[in-house]
C-alpha cells in the first residue's frame, strides 16, 4: 500500500521564539475535565465488557457527558453540599447482541462512580453527585460501518499534533500535575479543581493559577491567605525548574482582602462543580493535555469516542505521537513539527486521505536528508495504528 504522505518544509518562526505565547491547562477536577474523565472511563468499561463477552469491542461513543453544577455552602472549618451535581451520561452504545441484552446502564453508571471515587477523595459520590445514564443504541448505519475486521474510519475528520512542547507549555502542564500530585501530601487543602494559564511575553512567563481550596482544612481567612502565599512560593519553586526565564506567579486573583473584607476561593469538595460550575466533554484540554491557541488544534473531543475506528480519537493521538517521534529520531535539526491526518468515512484507518507533515528546521539545515526518514516513520506509525486500541482500553493513553 502506498499511503498519501506529504512532508514539506515550513518557513516561519517557531512558537517558542515568538514574542507572545499563551497556554492553558484545566486540571483533573475542572468540570470540563471531569466530563472528559468520566466519558473515557465509561468507554473503557464498555470496551472491556464487550471484549470479555463477545471477543471484540462493539460500537459505542460515550463522548456526550454533561456536568451540571450543584449548590454548596462552604465555610472555614467545613461547609455543606446543599444540592448534588447532576451528571448526564449520553451517547450511543451496542445494547443488544443477538438475544443478549447488554447491562449498559449498570456498566456506565458504575464506571462513572468508580472514576469519581478513585480521583476525588473529598467528594461523597453517594451524596454529592447524581448520575443519570441516557445512553442509547447506535444508528444502524454506524453499527454496520463499525466492523473491527474492516477497521474503516467512521467519520470524515482530522487529527492534529505538534512537537516539541515549548518551555511555557511544559511549565503549564507540569504545574497542574504538581498541584494535583506531589503537592497534595504537603498541602491537602489544595483541591482538585485547578486551572493554570501561562502567558509568555518575550523572556517573562506569567503563571495564573486558580486553585479551589478545601474548607475543612482551613480555620479562618488569615490562614487561607497564609496558605495562598505559601502556595505561590511552591509553584514558583517548581516552575523555575523548567526555564531560565523570569517567572511570575499569581494565585486566585479574584480573592478580596481589603477594608476588613476577606473573600477566598473556598469549596467543600475541592471542586467548583459543587457550586454551579458546569462542564462538557471536549471543552477543555486537547489530547496532549493543553489548550494552545498559538498552535494548530483540532476541536474534536477525543474522550469517550470508540478506540477502534473513531478517527477523532485515533488521529489526534497518533498525530502527536508521530510529531514527538520525528523530533526524537531526527535530532537537533528539527525546531518544530506539525502533523495533520485527514480521514474519509469508510476508508481504512491506516490509509488516511492525507497525512501532512510540516517541519520547521533549525538554521540552514539540508532538509532533504530528513524527508525520506520522516515519510518512512509516518508510514510505519500508520501501519500500526490499531496498536493504540488496547492502550486506550487499558488507560495507558491520556486524552485530556
UniProtKB/Swiss-Prot annotation:
It is an enzyme of class 2 (transferase). Gene3D superfamilies: 3.30.300.10, S-adenosylmethionine synthetase, C-terminal domain, S-adenosylmethionine synthetase, N-terminal domain. Keywords: ATP-binding, Magnesium, Nucleotide-binding, One-carbon metabolism, Transferase. Pathway: Amino-acid biosynthesis; S-adenosyl-L-methionine biosynthesis; S-adenosyl-L-methionine from L-methionine: step 1/1. One of its GO terms (biological process) is S-adenosylmethionine biosynthetic process. Its EC number is 2.5.1.6. Its cofactor is Mg(2+). Signal peptide: none annotated. It comes from the Archaea. It catalyses: L-methionine + ATP + H2O = S-adenosyl-L-methionine + phosphate + diphosphate. PANTHER family: S-ADENOSYLMETHIONINE SYNTHASE. This is S-adenosylmethionine synthase.
Amino acid at each position: 500500500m502506498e499511503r498519501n504522505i506529504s512532508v514539506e518544509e515550513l518557513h516561519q518562526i517557531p512558537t517558542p521564539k515568538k514574542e507572545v505565547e499563551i497556554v492553558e491547562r484545566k486540571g483533573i477536577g475542572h468540570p470540563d475535565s471531569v466530563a472528559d474523565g468520566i466519558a473515557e472511563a465509561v468507554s473503557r468499561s464498555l470496551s472491556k465488557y464487550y471484549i470479555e463477552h463477545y471477543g471484540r469491542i462493539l460500537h459505542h461513543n460515550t463522548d456526550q457527558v454533561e456536568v451540571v453544577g450543584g449548590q454548596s455552602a462552604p465555610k472555614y472549618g467545613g461547609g455543606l453540599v446543599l444540592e448534588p451535581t447532576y451528571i448526564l451520561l449520553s451517547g450511543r452504545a451496542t445494547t443488544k447482541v443477538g438475544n443478549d441484552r447488554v447491562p449498559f446502564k449498570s456498566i456506565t453508571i458504575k464506571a462513572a462512580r468508580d472514576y469519581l471515587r478513585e480521583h476525588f477523595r473529598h467528594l461523597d459520590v453517594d451524596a454529592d453527585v447524581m448520575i443519570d445514564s441516557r445512553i442509547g443504541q447506535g444508528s444502524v448505519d454506524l453499527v454496520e460501518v463499525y466492523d473491527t475486521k474492516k477497521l474503516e474510519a467512521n467519520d470524515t475528520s482530522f487529527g492534529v499534533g505538534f512537537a516539541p512542547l515549548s518551555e511555557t507549555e511544559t511549565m503549564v502542564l507540569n504545574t497542574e500535575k504538581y498541584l494535583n500530585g506531589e503537592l497534595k501530601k504537603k498541602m491537602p487543602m489544595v483541591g482538585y479543581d485547578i486551572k493554570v494559564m501561562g502567558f509568555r511575553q518575550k523572556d517573562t512567563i506569567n503563571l495564573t493559577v486558580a486553585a479551589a481550596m478545601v474548607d475543612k482544612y482551613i480555620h479562618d481567612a488569615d490562614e487561607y491567605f497564609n496558605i495562598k502565599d505559601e502556595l505561590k512560593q511552591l509553584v514558583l519553586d517548581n516552575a523555575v525548574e523548567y526555564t531560565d526565564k523570569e517567572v511570575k506567579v499569581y494565585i486566585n486573583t479574584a480573592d478580596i482582602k481589603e477594608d476588613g473584607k476577606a473573600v477566598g476561593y473556598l469549596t467543600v469538595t475541592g471542586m467548583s462543580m459543587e457550586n454551579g460550575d458546569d462542564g462538557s466533554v471536549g471543552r477543555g484540554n486537547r489530547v496532549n493535555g493543553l489548550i494552545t491557541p498559538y498552535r494548530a488544534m483540532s476541536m474534536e473531543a477525543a474522550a469517550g469516542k470508540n478506540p477502534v475506528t473513531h478517527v477523532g480519537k485515533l488521529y489526534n493521538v497518533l498525530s502527536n505521537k508521530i510529531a514527538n517521534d520525528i523530533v526524537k529520531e531526527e535530532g537537533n535539526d528539527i525546531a518544530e513539527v506539525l502533523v495533520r491526518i485527514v480521514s474519509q468515512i469508510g476508508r481504512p484507518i491506516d490509509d488516511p486521505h492525507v497525512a501532512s507533515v510540516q517541519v520547521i528546521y533549525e538554521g540552514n539545515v539540508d532538509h532533504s536528508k530528513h524527508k525520506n526518514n520522516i515519510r518512512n516513520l509516518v508510514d510505519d506509525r500508520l501501519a500500526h495504528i490499531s496498536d493504540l486500541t488496547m492502550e486506550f482500553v487499558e488507560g495507558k493513553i491520556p486524552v485530556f
